[in-house]
Amino acid sequence: MEKLREFHEFKIKGNFIFDLYHTLEYYESLWKRKKSKYEDYDVIKKRVYKLKPVLDTIDRKKFVLAHIDAVPDNFLMTDTGKVYLIDWEYAGMQDIYVDLAMFAIYTGYTKEETDRLIRLYFDGDCSDEIYWRIMAYEAVGGLLWSNWCEFKEDLGIYFDKYPETQYGYAKKYS
């Protein structure tokens, strides 16, 4: 988390905004079937969209380059202990706390593990507002990546329990 925090502190700016809701809809539009495999998908999607008005109040001028795909496999450590962050295909301008949420959901963290991750990132000092935003991003990210998985499944690519885990975050935190 120290390396991710250091990266965020550079406050790099760019032109592309990674829009979570747009990307969620994009992957849904790629499905060959017209309905999700999850029976309660429409209900969960509505709950996730209820978070949007609050998340939309975040000042986009404060967005900086976020990795978006901060999965543990994308943190490479050399023999000398130097850490590199690789695989930038999803990177874009976004609230930095999206990276914390994505790290937690990619790794299948429980709420307790996510809380520990947040404490590490903030050295124990995270405001309630930021904590809530991270949880909201877990919900949106969970639905986004479960939609991505459904698209991939249409192509014959399967991910074991990963889609259900992602969908579970959308259900739990929305």
Predicted segments with their positions:
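Active-site activation/catalytic loop segments of kinase-like enzymes and analogous catalytic loops
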Residues: 97-126, 139-157, 169
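Conserved catalytic-loop position in the HRD/HxD motif
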Residues: 69, 87
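An alpha-helical support segment within catalytic cores of ATP-dependent transferases
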Residues: 12-68, 80
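Protein kinase-like catalytic domain
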Residues: 8-12, 59, 104, 125
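Regulatory N- and C-terminal appendages and interdomain linkers associated
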Residues: 170-174
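A glycine-centered beta->alpha junction motif in the catalytic cores
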Residues: 9-12, 26-36, 143-158
